[in-house]
Amino acid sequence: ADFPSAEYPGLIPQAGPKSRYRLIHWWYWLFERLWSLRGMENALMDFYLYPGQIHQLFDKLTDFYCRVLERGKSERAADGLFISDDIGTQKGPFFSLDIFREFFKPYYKRLIDKAHALDMHVWMHTCGNIELFLPDLIEIGLDVIHPIQKYTMDEAEIAKKFGGQITFWVGFDVQQIIPYGTPQEVAQEVRHLVDTFARKDGRF
């Protein structure tokens, strides 16, 4: 089968009004796309069994996403791209730092560099404990990270170590407080997140 074309009409989702910051979105960056095609067990083994093919896939995907950025800028006057890649579990990352640096970091950096060249930001959603990868994500210029998942990392420690180096778009506790909490507990959670992550320059 042919690789999907980034020139399809209507490929770029609608954005908000031009008077506001305009964010386009695209799910399934690299790892999510890999395991959606190969299954989780195969995907995790592929880094060791078929490294060349993984690089080939990630390179093609990055070409595709870079074109999405170009179209988002020209067709939607987008200010940023919100993209997802769940690379963490509740307990830790899916793979080692060495795997991340070989297979993910170069392609993440290429997309982020492309966005910055277009005067755009990259917002990344990634569930799970990804503290191990945060210094590298900051190094390659990621602008916004979401959500610093509850119960996977020490929120206060993350804010202390990395605050001022990257913008945190922090997420609510969607496993306990949102589905089961009282209105008071929801309000307390909001207060906790603001107190933990708020910065003087107005960004989380």
Task: State what each model feature region is.
Residues 2-204:
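Active-site loop segments of alpha/beta catalytic cores
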